[in-house]
Amino acid sequence: MTNRKSLAMVIPMLLAASNGVNALEVFHKHGNKLELYGSINPNHKLNHSFLANKITSHKDDTNAILGLSGEVNIADELFSYATIEYGIDLSVPEQLLDKQQPNNLRLGYAGFKYGNWGSIDYGRNYGVLHDVQALTNRSPYINKDSIFSYNDNYMTGRSNSLLTYKNDDIFGLIDGMSFILQYQDQSENRAQNQTNGPGWGISIKYETDVGLTAIGSCFSSQRFQSDKSNQDNKLTPSVGAYGLGFKYDANDIYIAAFYGEGRNLTPSLNILSDNNASKDQPYINKTQNIEAIAEYNFHSGFHPSLSYLDSKGQNLNIKDATTVPKNLELAKQINISTRYEFNKNISTYMNYTINLLKSDNVIKEQNIPTDNTIGAGIVYHF
């Protein structure tokens, strides 16, 4: 579970930068092209308690991602396109003795684009809330315990059955203004924390010529639940989230902030286990996140950064409510990071996560991590 989570979150920004920028061109003729992109990320992490010299755990998070993107020119301004992206966990043995699946299909979608009318595609893609939450994912080697970046959790992170319409510059009428409309079909026959009912989402972005960008995203869905007592399936409403964010990216400075609020979103199982979660109610009625990051480019290859995350859960619907407060800190951390870019393909990095949560009985019962983490690695991306 931990390996898969780390693989899913560790390098999304590097791949976004490599896709189309540093990608290897396999074929390009008559407006038709096929590109190969990916990354290899050997890295290691050490955990230790606050003010303790003893290392509590070691972890190898080495992974790789490989993607193919293609485009076919159908008519004058009509194109079809497709992307498939695969993640590989390189820290596991060749033959697993259990049924864990360390490798996964991250993305897989296809669609059409027609001039200023925009594009439409369907498949496994990024949820609409990722558009704004990605503003603070500037440091790709930081594993943020943010519920708004979890995958297969409605329209946050990557998810299945997404019909996505994108339009840049509002049909060519307003420079810098773009929007995304998204519909997610019902997903079932999977773990309860990964099912969802149908839902809709929208994201609006405005970019200026001076490096300022503002984004607002939201979605609303129904939660799919299986009532094992009578073997009947039912849909319950009121699952959704919204996020507001901005960034400044100019003059060698990158500053971004994100505020997100969700209702009835499902956290990872290491926070609220199946034994604690109520089968009749969502796990957390209200979740609030504040995220911020600042980075500077020294033009010598060094890119130091400082980031902050504060995630709170309110009105928790879990059993034994007398021993668990209704409001709970899910994550609170500061990340001090730096990376050095040897060239456009190779970089090395180091990150120190200061966990601001204090260990107590409630934190321990909910399996919320409180250790500080040191991580370092090398990334080759193309």
Curated annotation (Swiss-Prot):
Q: GO molecular function: any one?
A: porin activity
Output the superkingdom of the source species.
Answer: Bacteria
PANTHER family the record matches:
OUTER MEMBRANE PORIN N-RELATED, PROTEIN YDDL-RELATED
Q: This protein is called what? A: Porin-like protein BU359
Task: Please name the InterPro entries in this protein's record.
Answer: Gram-neg_bact_OMP, Gram_neg_porin_domain, Porin_dom_sf, Porin_gammaproteobac, Porin_Gram-ve
Ordered alphabetically, the record's keywords are: Cell outer membrane, Ion transport, Membrane, Porin, Signal, Transmembrane, Transmembrane beta strand, Transport
- Location, primary (coarse class): membrane
Task: State the oligomer form and interacting partners.
Answer: Homotrimer.
Q: Does the keyword Transcription regulation apply?
A: no
Q: Which residues form the signal peptide?
A: 1-23
Which Pfam family is one of this chain's hits?
Porin_1
Q: Which organism is it from?
A: Buchnera aphidicola subsp. Acyrthosiphon pisum (strain APS) (Acyrthosiphon pisum symbiotic bacterium)
List locations, semicolon-separated. Cell outer membrane
**Gene Ontology cellular-component terms listed:** cell outer membrane; pore complex
- Give a short account of what the protein does: Forms pores that allow passive diffusion of small molecules across the membrane.
